[in-house]
Amino acid sequence: MENKSKLIVLSILFTPNNILYYATQLNGNIIFWTSSGVHKQKNTKKVTLISITTVINYIKYKSVNYKGIHIRTKGFSKNKKLVIKQLKQSTLNILSISDKISWPHNGCKKRKIRRI
């Protein structure tokens, strides 16, 4: 199957314990996905600099045949700037970067904090 547009959308979902990466075509069909846990990183090691660079190297390897990449990020993490910086330093042709943050406007009540 030949991709005519040669553009992909890289969606990055930041969760508290992991970072998920989805590469899709412009119409939404998933090309590949990966995460830090797929690359043999476990527990708190999944959000370190070493695991981020290994995943970005994998993304570079998989997206060689594409002309450009649109990046969409979602979620909260202290490593968001680090991931975007690593992607900018790579040889990928980044066309746009968008960030979707959903702040609650005093919505649902927070969970009760667990006491040990």
UniProtKB/Swiss-Prot annotation:
Q: Which domain of life is it from?
A: Eukaryota
Q: How far does the signal peptide extend, from start to end residue?
A: none
Instruction: Name the Gene3D superfamilies on file.
Output: Ribosomal protein S11
Instruction: Report the principal subcellular site.
Output: mitochondrion
Q: Where in the cell is it found?
A: Mitochondrion
Family statement: Belongs to the universal ribosomal protein uS11 family.
Protein's recorded name: Small ribosomal subunit protein uS11m
Q: Which organism is it from?
A: Chondrus crispus
